[in-house]
């Protein structure tokens, strides 16, 4: 798990997602649902053993990043692949639903993502986000 700031955003999210999918968790310390989702995400990052990177953005401290992603409620998670948002979800979800979300986008365990893997970046509301242009 990586805590993201404006200074580390480019390296830890955009550049890192070129090699490994990055799940960006927008949260705040006062947010009750964030407190229940956070441990689930951290457990899954361990369980998935390198298939994705968990990056956490404190929306209170990093308002510029949250604004660039159009975050309106927390928790919000956005999956970044090859520098672009491919999908996401809002609100706390049980572990089974988070796993289903991850399994939809990540290569199976033991398989690296193919270089020619394509992601449908047009079909979700998150496709409209262009954070690299605004941060």
Predicted regions: what is each one?
Residues 1-19:
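N-terminal leader/targeting and pre-domain segments
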Residues 2-6, 22, 26, 37-64, ...:
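Thiol-based oxidoreductase modules, predominantly thioredoxin-like and allied folds used
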Residues 16, 20, 47, 51, ...:
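Conserved, well-folded catalytic cores of nucleic-acid-processing
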Residues 28-34:
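Hydrophobic heptad-repeat coiled-coil signature
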Residues 72-114:
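Non-catalytic, surface beta->alpha helical segment in thiol-disulfide oxidoreductase systems
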Residues 100-135:
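Non-globular targeting/processing and membrane-anchoring segments
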